[in-house]
Amino acid sequence: MRTHHKIAVAVVVIIVMLLALLIPRTGHADQTASFGDVVIRYSAISTDQLFPAVAQTYGIERSNRNGLVNIAVEKKGGTDASEMIAAVVTGKVADLTGHSRPIRFRETNEAGAVDYLGEFPIDSSGTYVFTINVSKIGQTTPYTVKFNRDYVAD
């Protein structure tokens, strides 16, 4: 009887641990901003978090001193790559002292899913402030997304 109880407890512990793996981490998960019928998805990470194969595919150096911003623009309510919207993406990153640098974005297209990737240096540990401007093709006034991320540079 006692052995069955230990096995049952072990199974419950394993199930709880596996379920915990399914819960998304919110620290650097994609975030969204809505502008009418447009949704902008954005995230920023240090490139050392990329899988080596992904970094190699996109020619990105993996390092805790390099950051990567990923932007996707889609039609609100879109469910697949056909709902992606072509855009012009520009932006800048600043530290809390106000030192600012432009971020150059490049378009990637994989199976119809369009993303805009921009790399930036992480000079020191701290909070970085991002200002991203997104314009649909033919649009003169951009949508602006602002967000912060904390980075640790060794």
Predicted regions: what is each one?
Residues 128-135:
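Short, aromatic- and glycine-rich surface loops/edge beta-strands on solvent-exposed regions
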Residues 110-117:
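Aromatic sugar-binding surface patches on proteins
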Residues 86-95:
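Extended low-complexity, serine/threonine- and proline-enriched intrinsically disordered segments
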Residues 67-77:
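Beta-strand-rich structural segments
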